[in-house]
């Protein structure tokens, strides 16, 4: 029996003999076999830049090698890290199903790149990492559920998969299930349509660790929330570990049932914020080392200073620089990096909205001094503009709730939540407020040259 991983490793060995080392290291080294769906061999690339290049340049080349190895003509599909999160991952069973050619099919494994050893720890994710490791070492005994929230590409999925890998390696016969809430919803709807709700429930209520991503997409789906509520209760009562991720804390997920919200708050809630400069440099160094790349320190510093949004874009920028260097056959320097990234740096740097910028713009609009936003004054003429500024800070920046609270005179994160909820409700009926906010955002973008 050949697994898809075995086939892919054999494929890579042939590819390596037919490509220059710089090209191989740039385009192929970080790829992995993702899954086999019917006659389609799915390959995972580290980011969309590499994915697009592979699709354009190497699809037929890879298909020919796969046919040479297996005697079978496959369709080849490439996906990137973000697309991977829409797939279901489960633990491979001891006797996996085989297709007619003896190739392992069906279930998808946890992403092999997402383990604790490859996770770079920094100030913005240290607590989330520690909590995830504690849960991995003692499932259902440390924090249950563990709720991790933060923006796109900051490492939530990485930590969830790392827990899954750790449990697999240290707990014999442990059943680990990873999926997105969208996948849960779609399967639930299909089970109702096909009269297979019992099979659906058996599948998700008989695992040792349930990892469910992007739970915010359950908002507004009453039937799915009902089903997940009972799934949660069953697993919790049987002392099975539940880990949930979201782009926001439970209190901020709209139209989420209170009973689910309260259960999400039973365990530990931790956030992940964008990496600081030191962490971004460390991420680039680790990525370069893992891919066998020799990147000058000044180049990594340049990239880290330019790309401060999330890890996915940071690593994508590094790959872009390396690829550009290979294509133009020039050494990697800070100047070359600037040339390679010129199309993406303007959008990532000039369009950053800051809390201080929001405070200044709202203050000018309502004739409120900046110091009043941070003061303890509660008069309506100050409190209401302050709430608007908090609302905009939550909507237009990646800052965490505690960070926003700090910028408004050290206020508690619950104050920020209250302000956001209040303005959100008023916007549903108050046309004057809608007009005010539209004008404020227009002024804000003008002040930061965002046209």
From Swiss-Prot:
Keywords: ATP-binding, Cytoplasm, DNA replication, DNA-binding, Lipid-binding, Nucleotide-binding. The keyword Ion transport does not apply. Residues 109-325 are annotated as: Domain III, AAA+ region. GO terms for cellular component: cytoplasm; plasma membrane. Residues 72-108 are annotated as: Domain II. ATP binds at residues 153, 155-157. Belongs to the DnaA family. Domain I is involved in oligomerization and binding regulators, domain II is flexibile and of varying length in different bacteria, domain III forms the AAA+ region, while domain IV binds dsDNA. GO terms for biological process: DNA replication initiation; regulation of DNA replication. This is Chromosomal replication initiator protein DnaA. GO terms for molecular function: ATP binding; ATP hydrolysis activity; DNA replication origin binding; lipid binding. The keyword Nucleotide-binding applies. Oligomerizes as a right-handed, spiral filament on DNA at oriC. It is found in: Cytoplasm. Residues 326-451 are annotated as: Domain IV, binds dsDNA. Residues 1-72 are annotated as: Domain I, interacts with DnaA modulators. It comes from Listeria welshimeri serovar 6b (strain ATCC 35897 / DSM 20650 / CCUG 15529 / CIP 8149 / NCTC 11857 / SLCC 5334 / V8). Plays an essential role in the initiation and regulation of chromosomal replication. ATP-DnaA binds to the origin of replication (oriC) to initiate formation of the DNA replication initiation complex once per cell cycle. Binds the DnaA box (a 9 base pair repeat at the origin) and separates the double-stranded (ds)DNA. Forms a right-handed helical filament on oriC DNA; dsDNA binds to the exterior of the filament while single-stranded (ss)DNA is stabiized in the filament's interior. NCBIfam families: DnaA, PRK14086.1. InterPro entries: AAA+_ATPase (IPR003593), Chromosome_initiator_DnaA (IPR001957), Chromosome_initiator_DnaA-like (IPR020591), Chromosome_initiator_DnaA_CS (IPR018312), DnaA_C (IPR013159), DnaA_dom (IPR013317), DnaA_N_dom (IPR024633), DnaA_N_sf (IPR038454). It comes from the Bacteria.
């Amino acid at each position: 029996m050949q697994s898809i991983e075995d086939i892919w490793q054999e494929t890579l060995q042939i590819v390596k003999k037919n490509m220059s080392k710089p090209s191989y290291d740039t385009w192929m080294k970080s790829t992995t076999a993702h899954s086999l769906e019917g006659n389609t061999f799915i390959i995972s690339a580290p980011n969309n830049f590499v994915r697009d290049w592979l699709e354009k340049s190497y699809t037929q080349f890879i298909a020919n090698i796969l046919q040479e190895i297996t005697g079978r003509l496959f369709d080849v599909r490439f996906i990137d890290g973000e697309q991977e999160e829409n797939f279901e991952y489960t633990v491979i069973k001891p006797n996996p199903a085989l297709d007619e050619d003896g190739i392992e099919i069906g279930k998808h494994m946890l992403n092999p790149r997402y383990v604790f050893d490859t996770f770079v720890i920094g100030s913005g994710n240290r607590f989330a990492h520690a909590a995830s490791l504690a849960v991995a070492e003692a499932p259902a005994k440390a924090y249950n559920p563990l709720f991790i929230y933060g923006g796109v590409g900051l490492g939530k999925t990485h930590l969830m998969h790392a827990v899954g890998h750790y449990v697999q390696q240290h707990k014999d016969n442990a059943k680990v299930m990873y999926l997105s809430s969208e996948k849960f919803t779609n399967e639930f709807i299909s089970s109702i349509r096909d009269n297979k709700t019992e099979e659906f429930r058996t599948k998700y209520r008989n695992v040792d660790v349930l990892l469910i991503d992007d739970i915010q997409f359950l908002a507004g789906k009453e039937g799915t929330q009902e089903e997940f509520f009972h799934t949660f209760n069953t697993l919790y009562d049987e002392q099975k570990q539940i880990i949930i991720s979201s782009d926001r804390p439970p209190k901020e997920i709209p139209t989420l049932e209170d009973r689910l919200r309260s259960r999400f708050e039973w365990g530990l809630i931790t956030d992940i914020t964008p990496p600081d400069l030191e962490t971004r440099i460390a991420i680039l160094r680790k990525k370069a080392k893992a891919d066998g790349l020799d990147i000058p320190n000044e180049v990594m510093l340049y990239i880290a200073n330019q790309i401060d949004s999330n890890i996915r874009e940071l690593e994508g920028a590094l790959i872009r620089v390396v690829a550009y260097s290979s294509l133009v056959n020039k050494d990697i320097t800070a100047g070359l990096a600037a040339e390679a990234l010129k199309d993406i740096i303007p959008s990532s740097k000039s369009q950053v909205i800051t809390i201080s910028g929001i405070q200044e713009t709202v203050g000018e609009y309502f004739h409120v001094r900046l110091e009043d936003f941070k003061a303890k004054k509660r008069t309506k003429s100050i409190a209401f503009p302050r709430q608007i500024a908090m609302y905009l800070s939550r909507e237009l920046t990646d800052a965490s709730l505690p960070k926003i609270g700090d910028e408004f005179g050290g206020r508690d994160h619950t104050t920020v939540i209250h302000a956001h909820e209040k303005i959100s409700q008023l916007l549903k009926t108050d046309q004057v407020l809608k007009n005010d906010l539209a004008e404020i955002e227009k002024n804000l973008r003008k002040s930061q040259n965002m046209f």
